[in-house]
Structures are given as structure tokens and as C-alpha cells.
């Protein structure tokens, strides 16, 4: 099935001289890696094509040096828009993709809705970068160090350094395929995970803010007035804080709440149970064990927390952990 979809995608790519690559707002390593990786892949294999990348400026991973292109609206009328790492239309940065001649999506979230003319969605992949890597391998496309490094970055970040459940034998096969190119792993991991001492102190302070529900759901709530003043947007802060609760012994569900100007950003996580239906109920989505949503206020956030607590209680009572993804 994937082989056929990859062939269809390659045919679409060959058909259009201009290709514009989109991804989700507030990009993480997988969004940026898939965007930069696909951009390099297309430029390496189709040097006569115009390839552009669009979206909000990335602040979380400056070492990736992924600049965004500013292009006029009229570029879309005869272009193929490629959408990466987006489980729904609300996630897509820059809605001009709707005016493109044709659209193509590569994604690894749980399927929620049709987004593109050709949707390639497989939630068994650990990352959108892994899906692009397999596309490159199956279609026998030329791979450069730039493309390989970007795609590897997304694979390692979205798999939690190859720890999360979505990591599979295929993950390592594709990582090995990418490592056929000279990736500087020491430099990559340093840029991804080394922190200034001041940031480590902040992490320690934030850990002191962790609270627990009756059934041991860990959570942090950050009010808008308590947001850091370094310019990071609330979704970026929220994603960073949720990871602090990942390795607490005896905690199987955790959530971070971060207020912004008009909503509360919620990052839901579990290492055992399917929390996705709760995120979907509140208008979000993602994966079985890693999902997100936004709610209008603190009261709604606390209601969501109650539902996570009830899930943890029911799951503990039945003692039947969920399976992968």
C-alpha cells in the first residue's frame, strides 16, 4: 500500500515545476526536520524545480538554520503544496496551501480528516521524518548529508532518542539508511540536548511546581503572568515543560497546561494508556500516548485533568495497559 502511495507522490512531484512545503505551527524537530529534509531531497534530485519552504519562524532549534521563504500568493496557482507532520487542517501553518493546484501530505498522526488531494498517513511511524526517509529509500532518490541529517534529527526527537513505543525495527533500518551519509552525531546530539546551566536551574525550579492528582496524574499549570520572558510562545513552553514529568516512577499519565492570551495549551502524555480520545474530545489530537489540545480557560483545563485522573483510576483498576502508539 505504501509503495503505491509513494509512487503516486513521486508522480505528483515530477508533474509540478514549483513545490511549496508546509508544516505545523510552532515547529518541533520532526516538523523542521521533515521540511528541511524534503526540501534538500527535492533540490538534490530535481535541480530544475523551484522548491520553497513556508511557515512561522522556528525558535526552538536555531542550530537547524531553517530559514523560511517569503513568496507571493500567486505562486500557489500552479504549484504542488506538500504538507508535513500535520494531523489536521488546524495545525497547518500558512493556509495558502488551500489555493495550490494540488496538495500532498506526509503524516504520522492518527488519521482524523482528509487534508490533501493525496494523503500519505501512517501512525505506525515514529515520525514524519521516518516516513520521508522511507519515501526516499523506496523511490531510490539520491540522499545528501543535508537531507539525511535533517531527517535523522526528526526521527531522534520524535522517538525520544529511540525510546518511545513507536520505535520499531523499521525505525532503526531507516536510521541506518540515513547514516549511510556522513551525519555528525556528536554535534547533532550536543545541539539537541546540551543546556545552559541557567536552563537546568529553571528545569529544577519547574520540577518543584509539579503536582499530582488523587490517582497520580502529574501536572504543571503555568499562568500567563508566570510565562518566561525570553520570547518563547506558550506552545513552545508547554512542550518543553511536559517532558520534565516523563520519568517519574509510578506516574503513567501526565499533562502540562500553559496559558496564552486567549486559551490554555494542553500537552497530554502517557507511557501506558491511550489518552488520545480525551484530547480529541477537547478539539485536539495526535497519538495514542502523546496528544495535545487547547481549551478556553483554567476551569476547562481542570475538567480535562479530572478526565485524565478518571482514566488513570480506571486503567489501574483493570491493570491492562494499552499497546503501541
How would you label these PLM feature ranges?
Residues 2-25, 29-62, 73-78, 157-325:
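Hydrophobic helix-and-loop "lid/oligomerization" segment in the mid-to-C-terminal part
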Residues 109-174:
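Short alpha-helices
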Residues 1-7, 90-92, 96-103, 123-132:
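An acidic intrinsically disordered interaction segment
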Residues 53, 83, 105, 120-122, ...:
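Structural signal for conserved beta-strand scaffold positions within catalytic alpha/beta enzyme cores
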Residues 58-69, 132:
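Membrane-interfacial amphipathic helices and adjacent loop/beta segments
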Residues 50-52, 102, 119, 142:
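Conserved beta-strand segments of alpha/beta enzyme cores
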Residues 37-39, 98-101, 121-122, 173:
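Glycine-rich, phosphate-binding/catalytic loops in enzymes
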Residues 65-118:
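Active-site cofactor/cluster-binding pocket
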Amino acid at each position: 500500500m505504501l509503495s503505491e502511495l509513494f509512487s503516486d507522490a513521486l508522480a505528483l512531484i515530477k508533474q509540478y515545476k514549483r513545490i511549496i512545503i508546509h508544516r505545523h505551527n510552532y515547529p518541533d524537530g520532526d516538523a523542521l526536520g521533515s521540511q528541511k529534509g524534503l526540501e534538500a531531497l527535492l533540490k538534490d534530485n530535481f535541480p530544475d524545480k523551484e522548491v520553497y519552504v513556508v511557515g512561522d519562524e522556528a525558535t526552538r532549534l536555531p542550530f537547524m538554520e531553517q530559514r523560511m521563504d517569503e513568496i507571493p500568493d500567486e505562486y500557489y496557482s500552479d504549484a504542488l503544496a506538500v504538507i508535513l507532520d500535520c494531523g489536521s487542517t488546524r495545525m497547518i501553518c500558512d493556509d495558502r496551501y488551500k489555493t495550490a493546484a494540488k496538495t500532498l501530505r506526509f503524516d504520522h498522526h492518527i488519521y482524523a480528516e482528509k487534508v490533501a488531494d493525496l494523503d500519505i498517513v501512517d501512525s505506525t511511524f515514529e515520525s514524519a521524518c521516518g516516513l520521508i526517509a522511507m519515501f526516499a529509500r523506496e523511490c531510490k532518490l539520491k540522499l545528501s548529508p543535508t537531507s539525511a541529517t535533517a531527517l535523522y534529527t526528526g526521527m531522534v526527537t520524535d522517538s525520544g532518542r529511540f525510546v518511545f513505543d513507536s520505535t520499531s525495527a523499521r525505525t532503526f533500518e531507516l536510521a541506518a539508511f540515513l547514516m549511510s551519509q556522513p551525519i555528525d552525531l556528536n554535534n547533532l546530539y550536543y545541539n539537541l540536548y546540551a543546556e545552559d546551566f541557567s536552563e537546568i536551574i529553571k528545569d529544577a525550579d519547574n520540577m518543584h511546581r509539579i503536582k499530582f492528582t488523587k490517582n497520580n496524574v502529574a501536572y504543571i499549570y503555568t499562568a500567563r503572568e508566570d510565562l518566561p520572558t525570553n520570547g518563547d510562545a506558550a506552545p513552545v513552553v508547554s512542550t518543553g515543560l511536559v517532558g520534565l514529568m516523563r520519568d517519574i516512577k509510578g506516574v503513567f499519565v501526565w499533562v502540562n497546561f500553559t496559558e496564552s492570551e486567549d486559551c490554555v495549551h494542553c500537552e497530554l502524555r502517557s507511557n501506558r494508556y491511550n489518552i488520545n480520545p480525551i484530547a480529541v474530545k477537547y478539539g485536539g489530537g495526535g497519538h495514542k500516548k502523546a496528544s495535545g489540545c487547547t481549551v478556553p480557560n483554567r476551569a476547562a483545563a481542570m475538567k480535562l485533568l479530572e478526565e485524565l485522573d478518571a482514566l488513570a483510576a480506571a486503567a489501574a483498576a483493570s491493570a491492562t495497559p494499552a499497546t503501541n502508539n
